[in-house]
UniProtKB/Swiss-Prot annotation:
<keyword id="KW-0119">Carbohydrate metabolism</keyword>
<comment type="function">
    <text>Degrades carboxymethylcellulose (CMC).</text>
</comment>
<keyword id="KW-0326">Glycosidase</keyword>
<protein>
    <recommendedName>
        <fullName>Endoglucanase CX</fullName>
        <ecNumber>3.2.1.4</ecNumber>
    </recommendedName>
</protein>
<comment type="similarity">
    <text>Belongs to the glycosyl hydrolase 9 (cellulase E) family.</text>
</comment>
<dbReference type="Pfam" id="PF00759">
    <property type="entry name" value="Glyco_hydro_9"/>
</dbReference>
<keyword id="KW-0136">Cellulose degradation</keyword>
<dbReference type="GO" id="GO:0030245">
    <property type="term" value="P:cellulose catabolic process"/>
</dbReference>
<dbReference type="InterPro" id="IPR012341">
    <property type="entry name" value="6hp_glycosidase-like_sf"/>
</dbReference>
<keyword id="KW-0378">Hydrolase</keyword>
<dbReference type="GO" id="GO:0008810">
    <property type="term" value="F:cellulase activity"/>
</dbReference>
<dbReference type="InterPro" id="IPR008928">
    <property type="entry name" value="6-hairpin_glycosidase_sf"/>
</dbReference>
<dbReference type="InterPro" id="IPR001701">
    <property type="entry name" value="Glyco_hydro_9"/>
</dbReference>
<keyword id="KW-0624">Polysaccharide degradation</keyword>
Length: 251
């Protein structure tokens, strides 16, 4: 929706100047896209998935952060502050989701401890994929055959979801007087939109499995999560004290 006429320089990572974070993120995007096209265009879907695997292999084989390779042009605004480990798990999780190739499941199990499995994250953004990965890993299509092996992911993702919900004993979030989730003083909406996606994804998981989330002494249903997500989206689109839309080209 934006017209941009400013220079958009292109940079690359390589075996000598690695960028596991940006490469694994690319692999994740390609794998996710392959799921979208699986039924309507199987050939294209297969090409996307094959490319995702190749890009992920590059990301894993030549480890390092793109901030260290081309930091002079990406920092401080787009430094990889979370490092590259979270993207490696993110990429492997999406490729497994798309392919059901067990080798990626083995990769996640073998590398999870090193790449962030033990960390209980409370942020979701373009830079930090840790929480997003854990929510992805508890989705029914991934966990129905491997539930016991990923209980830690399920516990961490549940802690994250509960931390966002006012009225629960696990609540750790901050909201503005108008009701917008507040994560950072700069570019806050990126965190709001990422968090909203995770709320809806977790709600879908709950609905599919016919369960509820336990937040301390509170029981939270999928409908509660959907309602909170809707409040955030409505706020962004204009249902806020200022009565303005924060989405370019809408409202």
């Amino acid at each position: 929706p934006e017209d941009m006429d400013t220079p958009r320089n292109v940079y690359k990572v390589s075996t000598q100047n690695p960028g596991s974070d940006v490469a694994a993120e690319t692999a994740a995007a390609l794998a996710a896209a392959s799921i979208v096209f699986k039924d309507s265009d199987p050939s294209y879907s297969g090409k996307l998935l094959h490319t995702a695997m190749k890009v992920f292999d590059f990301a894993d084989r030549y480890r390092g952060s793109y901030s260290d390779s081309i930091g002079s042009v990406v920092c401080p605004f787009y430094c990889s502050y979370s490092g590259h480990h979270d993207e490696l798990l993110w990429g492997a999780s999406w490729i497994h989701r798309a392919s059901q190739n067990r080798s990626y499941l083995v990769y996640i199990k073998s590398n999870g401890h090193i790449l962030g499995e033990d960390d209980d994250g409370f942020s979701a953004s373009w830079d930090d994929k840790e929480t997003g990965t854990k929510v992805l890993l508890v989705s029914k299509s991934f966990l129905e055959r491997h539930v016991e092996e990923f209980q830690l992911y399920k516990a961490h993702s549940g802690n994250y979801i509960c931390s966002l919900l006012p009225g629960t004993s696990n609540f750790q979030g901050q909201y503005t007087p108008g009701g917008l989730l507040y994560k950072a003083s700069e570019s806050n909406l990126q965190y709001v939109t990422s968090t909203t996606l995770l709320l809806l994804t977790y709600a879908k998981y709950l609905r599919t499995n016919g369960g509820v989330a336990t937040c301390g002494s509170s029981k939270v249903t999928a409908e509660t999560l959907i309602s909170e997500a809707k409040k955030q989206v409505d706020y962004i689109l204009g249902n806020n004290p200022a009565k303005i839309s924060y989405m370019v080209g809408f409202g």
